[in-house]
Regions:
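Multi-pass alpha-helical transmembrane bundles in non-GPCR membrane proteins
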Residues: 1-185
């Protein structure tokens, strides 16, 4: 919602753009927080203390990112890379649970036992890749002025966030169905 409002009204005036761009990035932080809850909930359903721990962690980090995105002092162009790095670390930290999943289960290198993990992995990679593209300003750094309207790193970042969210959503539906058939042992 926030991103749609920003992209619809950002050319209204400088002040409107300045305020709405904060909501644009802050909304992405909220979206990422929300897309991490189902994987944590369903995967750690039988070890719910882990689920709660990961949910608290991602919420605290995500709200920190939200706060930075909303802070007027970070509006300056010199902080653009720092904001991108915050999103990169956000994507990486959201995937910390995947390390535990691989270390403590029999799913290492295989998605057969837990088919929804594939979507969660690739959703996380999509978040991370989007942040890297945003930080490196690809493709506009190679052809300045060519990608002002469409195809710039900001657009690609949004696309990668939506792709990651969609993959997490699809994986969560698969995990829900998996949980219906596979109760805790």
């Amino acid at each position: 919602g926030f991103s749609s409002i920003f992209h619809l009204f950002h050319s209204h005036s400088k002040i409107v753009r300045k305020v709405l761009v904060r909501f644009d990035y802050a909304g992405i932080a909220i979206l990422i927080i929300g897309s991490c809850y189902p994987p944590y909930y369903y995967y750690f359903y039988c070890k719910f203390n882990f689920a709660i721990g990961y949910m608290v962690f991602i919420t605290v980090y995500g709200l920190t990112v939200f706060g930075v995105m909303m802070a007027p002092q970070f509006d300056k162009p010199k902080y653009m890379k720092i904001k991108g790095i915050l999103f990169l670390v956000f994507g990486i930290s959201a995937g910390i649970a995947m390390i535990q999943i691989n270390l403590f289960t029999e799913t290492i290198g295989s998605f057969e036992n837990e088919p929804h993990l594939k979507e969660w992995y690739f959703g996380g990679l999509s978040y991370i890749l989007g942040a890297v593209i945003y930080i490196l300003r690809i493709p506009e750094r190679f052809k300045p002025g060519t990608f002002c309207l469409i195809g710039n790193s900001h657009n690609i970042f949004h696309f990668m966030v939506l792709l990651g969210f969609g993959l997490h959503f699809y994986g969560s539906i698969k995990a829900y169905n998996y949980r219906l058939d596979n109760a805790c042992m």
